[in-house]
Amino acid sequence: MNIQAPVKVDKAERMRRAREEAYATPLSQFHPGAPRLFQDDTLWPWFERLRKEEPVHYCTNAPIEPYWSVVKYNDIMHVDTNHGIFSSDSKLGGISIRDVPEGYDYPSFIAMDQPRHSAQRKTVSPMFTPQHLDELAKLIRQRSQTVLDNLPRNETFNFVERVSIELTTQMLATLFDFPWEERRKLTRWSDVSTALPKSGIVASAEERRREMDECYAYMSKLWNERVNSAPRNDLLSLMAHNEATRHMDPDNLMGNIILLIVGGNDTTRNTMTGSVLALNENPEQYDKLRANPELIDTMVPEVIRWQTPLAHMRRTALQDTEIGGKHIRKGDRVVMWYVSGNRDEEMFDKPNEFIIDRPRPRTHLSFGFGIHRCVGMRLAELQLKIVWEEMLQRFDRIEVVGEPKRIYSSFIKGYETLPVRIPG
């Protein structure tokens, strides 16, 4: 499949060309994991065709090892909940479509099988209890108010930088009890840890390695401080004072730290940005929300479905098995495309429409299912809910005034920039 460099054309024409190419390309040449499709936002017809014609598809036409694409909701659920057959172990390649690069095998509980997975995951769970979320809600609201009150009026600015990154970075600094003045390091490390070389985030694998080494050195210092001090209410301290994680080797420590940084950054940050874009692309839904702010409660999970901030998760087959009538061999990589399952026509009514009062909005796949379901999903929902409550109180409308710039990745489905303007 030949993906051309993006051309400056309007969205409707871009999608027309993408649909034409997707339906003209032989299925044997499909590579739905090509990052360019996600950066150009032209992935949709490719996955639409797979759902219709070959919902379990084997790709051999890619610059990476062959992989299975699982694109329908129920098939994805089957893979996601059968952890005895489908492994996320980093030693087998990890959780993304590309194998873990040599020297980057940092095992984390999301890239572990049982019983180690649950033992380590339970260590950080107290941070996300309903009681603790109630405590965090006050802080989230105060910070949202401060950030929003300082936004310019009648002036174009980057919503990603001024709002999404700033609010998620502040929360990460709180969760880790990280030095406040250096909090932007956390989102930088998150971006670098998932970036491809020449993606615009890092120029080379060597640059990525240098920055990850910096992350390791910095977080190791904080870790040693937590180990040698009384327990505190932050993620590092929870791990430092629990027997399941206290004696982690350095790679396991680094893996869990990166997991928690990325998890706390990408879902909220990119869905927050995506919500502004979705409401601008669907002005009748924006009007509906402004007329009835109580719809925030259903709008939040709907925009998480709509955005799908983590486009896929990968597993490795531990034995010969079958998905959708296709024979999967032991050792095969199996990619669950959440971004496609969330648009499955057999699961969702009008799946390509953004409907803020959609019935049963939490049936989306964006947080995964089974033992690896996102541990911080309620915190992500809470942050999105509060920021929209505060935005609706302050602004009649936030207007998108230019095309977003999307990340070059088929793993993190997010944004670098979203130019907006607040009238008034």
Annotated model-derived regions:
Residues 1-424:
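Cytochrome P450
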